[in-house]
Design a protein with these regions (language model features):
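Oxyanion-binding/catalytic loops of NTP- or PPi-dependent enzymes
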Residues: 1-27, 37-51, 58-224
């Protein structure tokens, strides 16, 4: 995507880091400008994703006590062909051999089918299941028909602008306004403060999900 893409512009409101566009080998790419060791570094999306995959690879090797090379990666159903190819590039940078990119709706459907042995025979009426996936940044819904040894994805839909972070954002906006009125400080004027507020609001959201009592918000060293 380019810097003027509506999806990119929508995403910028959630992120404290600086997003820019840079010509790399004749191709205009999005980069993230980050400060590292007193220098500004420009990192592509592929490079950042490769860092995550490298970390996962390291964790896997430590737990399995063996070298991890092959992998299968699940992706949202709305990923474009370009986004899928970029993810494959990230896997290659991380030293991983991606055997297959699988839609997340298909992955969860397979996982469900593997552990259910009471599915109807092939010539019988299928067992219909709806899967609702509320992720951090998106919502995905899929309807799947099951028979023994067989599944069919009947349909999928998504909203890639609705996720758990939208609940965090409501809490963040509330506390940002409250702090500004009571303490004359603006949490959104400082990137570190904004990140701290986001982290605490996410914790608060999780506590609120399972607790109906009054829950305090505690942030140490907020603006410094």
């Amino acid at each position: 995507r380019k810097i003027n893409d509506p999806q990119v512009q929508s995403e910028r409101q959630y992120q404290p880091f600086r997003i820019a566009q840079q010509n790399i080998n004749g191709d205009e790419k999005l980069v993230f400008n980050v400060d590292y060791l007193n220098e500004t570094k420009s990192l592509t999306i592929e490079q950042i994703m490769a860092m995550f995959l490298t970390k996962l690879k390291t964790i896997g090797e430590m737990n399995l006590n063996t070298k991890v090379v092959d992998c299968v990666i699940s992706v949202p159903v709305y990923f474009t062909d370009a986004e899928r190819r970029a993810l494959l590039d990230s896997a290659q940078i991380a030293g991983l051999n991606c055997l297959k990119l699988m839609n997340e709706s298909t992955a969860v459907a397979l996982a469900y089918g593997l552990y259910h042995n009471n599915l109807p025979d092939v010539n019988e009426k299928p067992h219909i299941v709806a899967f609702v996936d509320m992720g951090y940044t998106h919502l995905q819904v899929s309807i799947v028909a099951y028979n023994k040894g067989k599944l069919r994805v009947m349909g999928t839909n998504f909203d890639n602008n609705l996720g758990g972070r939208d609940f965090d954002r409501v809490l963040m906006d509330y506390f940002q306004k409250d702090f500004k009125e009571r303490y004359k400080i603006d949490a959104y004027s400082n990137s570190r403060a904004r990140l701290r507020l986001r982290a605490e609001c996410e914790k608060l959201k999780k506590l609120m999900s399972s607790n109906s009592s009054v829950i305090p918000l505690n942030i140490e060293c907020f603006m410094n």
